[in-house]
């Protein structure tokens, strides 16, 4: 199955998987949530815990870490089953708010240069800050269902006021918005910009069906740090 992409975004530096130079960007905290349904991206926050959007709660879920390249193996590849999945207590399928879940791995991930947890943001980032949007993409020769590249781009964070004035931002609370400088339109485009990383900390994680035009809406992770820490403590 071949996915066809339409990419028309310019927001700082983007290392497109369809450019002449393909490379795997350094984002060792990203994990691929593999299932028989739509692809999803999660973030390793501890060696045995992954933070992900709650809408990624799918049957037969497997957590893939390390190298994702199909034809190139380097020994960092890991596939771990979830042993426990905890959705945020207030999450609802009928509303986009609180779209978070925690995945407890059956065993701790083996940390290496391509598998590393990332710290959580504990404060709100200032509007105008240039942050990195980190996600997964398909390489040019990948005709399969699953992404095989980590890709990064840069984009500025919007103010809360500007966010609430957008069509998407009106219906989201506890959110952070970023500005795509040109329209971003592609199949499974949310995978390529799945997380917001500011000052080397996880600031945002994508909300289901969050993109429209030139704005991306993300769950503001720092609003949920207390829940995350209490849930994962000593486990």
Swiss-Prot record:
GO BP annotations listed: binding of sperm to zona pellucida; cell migration; germ cell migration; positive regulation of acrosome reaction; positive regulation of fertilization; protein maturation; proteolysis; regulation of protein processing
Q: So what does this one do?
A: Plays a role in male fertility. May have a role in sperm migration or binding to zona-intact eggs. Involved in the activation of the proacrosin/acrosin system.
Record gene name: PRSS37
Which ranges carry the Peptidase S1 domain?
20-233
Q: Which residues form the signal peptide?
A: 1-19
Instruction: Write the protein's name.
Output: Probable inactive serine protease 37
Q: Which UniProt keywords apply?
A: Cytoplasmic vesicle, Disulfide bond, Fertilization, Secreted, Signal
Mind naming one GO cellular-component term on file for this protein?
acrosomal vesicle
Q: Which cysteines are joined by disulfide bonds?
A: 40-56, 131-198, 163-177
Q: Which family does it belong to?
A: Belongs to the peptidase S1 family.
Q: Where does this chain mainly localize? A: cytoplasm
Taxonomic classification, please? Eukaryota, Metazoa, Chordata, Craniata, Vertebrata
Write out the annotated subcellular location.
Cytoplasmic vesicle, Secretory vesicle, Acrosome; Secreted
- Recorded source organism is Bos taurus
């Amino acid at each position: 199955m071949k996915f066809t992409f339409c990419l028309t975004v310019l927001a700082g530096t983007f290392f497109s998987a369809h450019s002449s130079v393909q490379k795997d960007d350094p984002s060792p905290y990203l994990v691929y949530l593999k299932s028989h349904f739509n692809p999803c991206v999660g973030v390793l926050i501890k060696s045995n815990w992954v933070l992900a959007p709650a809408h990624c709660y799918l049957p037969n879920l497997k957590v893939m870490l390390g190298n994702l390249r199909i034809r190139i193996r380097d020994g960092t590849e890991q596939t771990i089953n979830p042993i426990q999945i905890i959705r945020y207590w207030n999450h609802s399928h009928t509303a986009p708010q609180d779209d978070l879940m925690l995945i407890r791995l059956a065993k701790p991930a083996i940390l290496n240069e391509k598998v590393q947890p990332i710290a959580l943001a504990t404060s709100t980032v200032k509007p105008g800050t240039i942050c990195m949007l980190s996600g997964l993409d398909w390489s040019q020769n990948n005709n399969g269902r699953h992404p095989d590249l980590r890709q990064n781009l840069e984009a500025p964070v919007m103010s809360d006021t500007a966010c609430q004035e957008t069509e998407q931002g009106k219906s989201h609370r506890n959110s952070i918005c970023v500005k795509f400088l040109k329209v971003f339109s592609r199949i499974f485009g949310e995978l390529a910009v799945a997380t917001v990383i500011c000052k080397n900390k996880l600031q945002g994680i994508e909300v289901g069906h969050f993109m429209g035009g030139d704005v991306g809406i993300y769950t503001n992770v720092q609003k949920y740090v207390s829940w995350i820490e209490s849930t994962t403590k000593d486990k």
